[in-house]
Amino acid sequence: MDRTLIQEILEVVEQAAIASAELTGLGQKDEADAAAVEAMRKRMGSIQMQGRIVIGEGERDEAPMLYIGEEVGSGSGPGVDFAVDPCEGTNLCANNQRGSMAVLAASDRGGLFNAPDFYMKKLAAPPAAKGKVDIRKSATENINILSSCLGMAVSELTIVVMDRARHKDLIAEIRSTGARVQPISDGDVQAAIACGFAGTGTHCLMGIGAAPEGVISAAAMRALGGHFQGQLVYDPAIAMTKEWADYTKEGNIARLNEMGITDGDKIYEADELASGENVVFAGSGITDGLLFNGVKFEKDCTRTSSLVISTLDSTARFTNTVHIKDGAKSISLS
């Protein structure tokens, strides 16, 4: 990968965000997702690369575009693997709530963990706590470590947790330490990455979310130098989700084995989930969020706010782009 490719990857998420944002607040989450998928795939198709989707919209028989294993790009150039979520937080987009974004991770061929469509226990924390907090430890232990690493009182810490029934005990434990809990309804990728930046008011992400999004978060946190660990969850009694109502622990273990994952309890570090020499994260806001604004439609232009983090040059670039419409007569500075 090179810097030219990184610029094109930025444009991929920008176009997906704009497409979804056209439907913000209309209650049409599936349509918003489909629009983002189509826009993302179209822009990817114009890039000089041998791209491959390793995490996408599902298996080939489940998704018409951006399915796992789909080849994208011109068919010549560098080999690049992608983990994509064209509209992360579809409910957030449909309801015009904060935190929806178009997002992807990219790496050299073979550089991203092909996460199954399972759940994942996650722990994200700032660079100062890297290697000190640990997903094996209790929430209380990690909060105390985080307090020490950041030089902050426990009462000043904010821990983000997905608002799910499975997290009832976790939330109670966090609050018992004196730390604050920020429950979120959807979209834990942005919350995880926000832990890597000071000043966001978010100091740690704990709890269980989707495994594919865990890979995208890991790519960003690896490039930032932050802490990220993930552990697959295969027990329906722990996941506590209606999607697994008919699944069994034994059946899920068998599914993992079929995918070549023989140790379902393995704890993955960020550099195992995103192991490539060159790793890039790109996200563009659909709605306003912790890291950037959502898409803004104006008479003569459309504005996007995005973030690209890359190990290639050790940068995190916040980008505000003005997409000028044909016949534009007046473009304001902001």
Curated annotation (Swiss-Prot):
Statement: the UniProt record of this protein carries the keyword 4Fe-4S: no
EC top class named in words: hydrolase
Keyword Metal-binding in annotation: yes
GO biological process terms, semicolon-separated: fructose 1,6-bisphosphate metabolic process; gluconeogenesis; glycerol metabolic process; reductive pentose-phosphate cycle
Function: Catalyzes the hydrolysis of fructose 1,6-bisphosphate (Fru 1,6-P2) and sedoheptulose 1,7-bisphosphate (Sed 1,7-P2) to fructose 6-phosphate and sedoheptulose 7-phosphate, respectively.
Stated family: Belongs to the FBPase class 2 family.
Protein name, per record: D-fructose 1,6-bisphosphatase class 2/sedoheptulose 1,7-bisphosphatase
